[in-house]
Amino acid sequence: QEIVVENDVMKVRFSTGGGIVRSVTLKDYTRYGRQGERNEPIEMFVPESAKFDLSFFIKNGLNNVKVNTSEYTFTADPVVRTDTAQIVRMRLPVAEGAALEYRYVVYDEATPSRDYLVDYTVRLVGMAPYMANQSSIGIAWSNTSYRNERGFKNENMYTTVAYRVPGE
């Protein structure tokens, strides 16, 4: 299932397959086309290249079973609209009363300093008894960017993707 959320400056497509961001389109910027014309909206990355996977082990009786989130389909709640944002929430049930929850927040024009941001939060709901004595979760994240500028040198100089870990 695909979930589409838009604000004034971007369109974000989410997929319940793996609970991932499938694509991001910037509305106010254009990229150079094949003939040198600048009329195509900027796609931040090739949708087919969107790879995101959390891996961890859960207890299943006497065994530990590896979970790779990219191999599962999440269930999505309806998109919640607030005065300043739209919230996409997806859950992956792991056991009775236990789930992995992804929460994405796409801000709107009421918060212009955040309008190009997508906040992402992972919650382990009721999972402590199932977490197989581990203190960390593995993450694998990769995307292939489109070439949006004429020159490779300029593109490398001005392209940035950033993340922040809460508490840092």
Predicted regions and their residues:
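Soluble non-transmembrane domains of integral membrane proteins
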Residues: Q1-E168
